[in-house]
A protein has these predicted regions:
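Radical SAM enzyme core and accessory elements
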Residues: 2-13, 33-34, 52-173, 191, ...
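Flexible glycine/acidic-rich beta-alpha junction loops that bind and position SAM and/or redox cofactors
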Residues: 41-53, 258-263, 423, 475-480, ...
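Canonical Radical SAM [4Fe-4S] cluster-binding loop centered on the CxxxCxxC motif
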Residues: 355-393
Length: 634
């Protein structure tokens, strides 16, 4: 008999990722079941894509394209309109292929004689074979038919996504939906207007799927976890549909976006769609909320919960201990269609593909961050500041349970930065218990990762790591309290690479006081790290100052002045600032990203870094052998 006579449905709202479920519902469902609550889950993000990218979905899309006036036609919609029957004839087979259900189709896809090719395929013309042979041979060789076909299939699906965006809903992307309506949006008005507007093809599809989920699960409570701004609009559209069809169902909003951006929520209209909004770790607030719905706890005793009373937003927080990380239970993917996710190959880079290819079980080694000092990070918030680790025994118990349930042995450790001590213990436990898995995750490039430890991690199944090199400048790394140096990062990343572990570097530009010279020097350092085989992949992030970060809380310490925020009743996170250096970081970012894209394809590693910029920049001051010397001295 359940402790609570309620039925909780946790929903993944569009859009997150396509190759594997976003883990929030698996975590919540596993926890609630461990406490005796009837809990189920549904991935409407995947559902929307599978409905739209089907023969029936393309027939609907074709109608949208036909209704476009000639002046609104784009290269994408024109290419699609010229051969809709070829798209309709191939879409279901391509989806089956990227789901892993029809591997022999790879030969036909790779031939380039079967799929209709839209503008996305133009990128293949950039690859030139000097001998006039296969321009993609450098990436796939003679036998890489499956990967070649997966890349072609991804281009094909991206073409259709472009048509969907141009003809049916300009807000649609595979990994985000209507993001601008929520990100640091001080007023709820843009979102309210979008929710009141006529439904698009994507909206109608989402409404149909929501109705089907309600009929299937018959929930009394629906939890919508929104990790990113690009999931918020869809979550509100789902809640709107629920309140139209079943106003008796309690709707609850939570997740990473709420935790970072809605902490000062005062907009009553949010509660036209959601009965409650909870902050930070969801376990304790949900337990108190379920008790309240049972009549066993008064509203005054809720935990970290917003609600509307007498037309005004009220925040209620009875301080109670959070559920220890060791007691949150094992995530469960029960109820999610694990054989229906799409493994895609966008970037021809072995490390970068991990984010879009493969059905990875998500697992957290520890709650929060053990370092929690970085100046750009939201270190004042619970998801960073409350560090709570589980033992290696507990983690491997969870791993074994997840493998038994899913039949999948790949794990993505989704910590902000997994602690070296915990990873060492995890590796030892995996090896001692002879648990064979593949795993990868986020770390800090600190000196604790010795060559010996890196090899131990590889022996336990570690295939890749990602970590922050950020600005690649010792002065700026010290200013941001990163706790590493460039030379240290070089030695640690090389230790991982030498152990056969792929390395991805998170890179940053536009940090306070960063000059053009600093930026050019950083790119030269990154070039050397690629050339030395220390890193195989990277991504440049434009620094954004948030109100919860040390920079946002004490801007004078970083030499910048914050611009006043408008009145906020909805979302608050990013805050603009004035940096006296006056550098045009956006212009520099174009060159940085161009260089990195080429480095990840093994191109331009000997070129002067100034060649990547469209305007004059100073010569790099970094010695061309800086990284080589650091590795030799290590």
């Amino acid at each position: 008999m359940n402790e609570f006579p309620v039925r909780v449905l946790s929903v993944i709202a569009p859009m997150t990722q396509l190759n594997t479920p976003y883990p929030s519902t698996a975590y919540l469902t596993g926890f609630l079941r461990s406490r005796g609550v009837a809990a189920v889950q549904e991935d409407l993000a995947l559902g929307v894509v599978l409905a739209l990218f089907s023969r029936e979905g393309l027939q609907r899309l074709c109608g949208e394209v036909e209704r476009l006036p000639a002046a609104a036609r784009t290269a994408c919609t024109t290419a699609f309109a010229q051969r809709p029957e070829r798209y309709a004839a191939t879409i279901d087979a391509v989806i089956a292929f990227v789901q892993g259900r029809d591997s022999t189709l790879a030969h036909r896809i790779a031939s380039r004689n079967w799929l209709p090719e839209g503008p996305r395929f133009d990128a293949l013309d950039a690859y030139v074979d000097e001998d006039g042979g296969d321009p993609l041979g450098w990436a796939f060789g003679a036998l890489g038919v499956q990967d070649r076909a997966r890349h072609m299939a991804t281009l094909y699906l991206n073409d259709i996504a472009d048509v969907l965006r141009d003809a049916a809903d300009p807000r649609f992307e595979f990994v985000r939906y209507a993001e601008s309506l929520a990100r640091s949006q001080p007023s709820f008005e843009p979102l309210a207007q979008a929710l009141a507007a006529p439904c698009t093809l994507v909206d109608r599809t989402l409404q149909d799927l929501t109705q089907a989920a309600l009929l299937k699960h018959q929930p009394t409570v629906v939890l919508l976890s929104v990790p990113f701004p690009g999931t918020v609009y869809a979550a509100f559209r789902i809640a709107q549909t629920i309140k139209t069809l079943r106003p008796d169902i309690t709707t609850v909003l939570g997740g990473g976006f709420v935790n970072t951006e809605l902490r000062d929520l005062s907009e009553p209209r949010v509660f036209d769609h959601f009965d409650f909004v909870t902050l930070d770790g969801g376990e304790r607030p949900l337990l108190s909320l379920l008790e309240h719905l049972q009549g066993r706890r008064s509203v005054q005793r809720l935990v970290r919960t917003f609600l509307r009373q007498d037309g005004r937003v009220r925040y209620v927080h009875l301080a109670e201990p959070d559920v220890p990380f060791a007691e949150v239970g094992t995530p469960t993917w029960d109820g999610l269609p694990l054989d229906r996710y799409l493994s895609l190959l966008d970037m021809l880079n072995p490390m970068h593909r991990l984010w879009s290819d493969g059905r990875w079980n998500k697992l957290t080694v520890a709650h929060g961050c053990y370092w929690k000092k970085c100046s750009f990070c939201d270190v004042s918030l619970d998801y960073i500041s409350r560090y709570d680790a589980a033992t290696a025994t507990t983690l491997v118990d969870r791993i074994e349970a997840i493998v038994a349930e899913t039949g999948q042995t790949g794990f993505h450790l989704v910590d902000e930065a997994a602690p070296p001590k915990s990873l060492k213990a995890l590796a030892a436990e995996l090896l001692a218990r002879r648990v064979g898995i593949s795993w990868w995750g986020n770390i800090r490039f600190e000196k604790s990762f010795t060559p010996l430890l890196c090899q131990q991690l590889a022996d336990s199944g570690c295939i890749a790591v990602s970590g922050g090199l950020e600005v690649a400048s010792d002065r700026l790394l010290a200013l941001m309290k990163k706790g590493v140096s460039v030379e240290q990062v070089a030695r640690v990343t090389k230790a991982f690479a030498d152990a056969g572990i792929l390395v991805h570097a998170y890179l940053m530009y536009g940090f306070p006081t960063q000059t053009v010279q600093d930026t050019v020097d950083a790119l030269e350092t990154v070039r050397q790290l690629f050339a030395a085989g220390c890193i195989q992949s990277g991504f440049w992030h434009r620094f954004a100052c948030t109100v919860h970060s040390p920079v946002g809380l004490d801007p004078q310490a970083y030499g910048v002045t914050l611009l006043p925020l408008p009145p906020v009743s909805f979302a608050k996170n990013d805050v603009d600032f004035v940096d006296p250096t006056g550098v045009d970081h956006d212009a520099l970012g174009v060159g940085l990203k161009k260089a990195l894209y080429n480095y990840m394809h093994g191109i331009g590693l000997e070129a002067d870094v100034r060649e990547w910029f469209d305007f004059p920049v100073p010569k790099a001051r970094v010695p061309r052998q800086r990284i080589a010397r650091a590795l030799a001295d290590g």
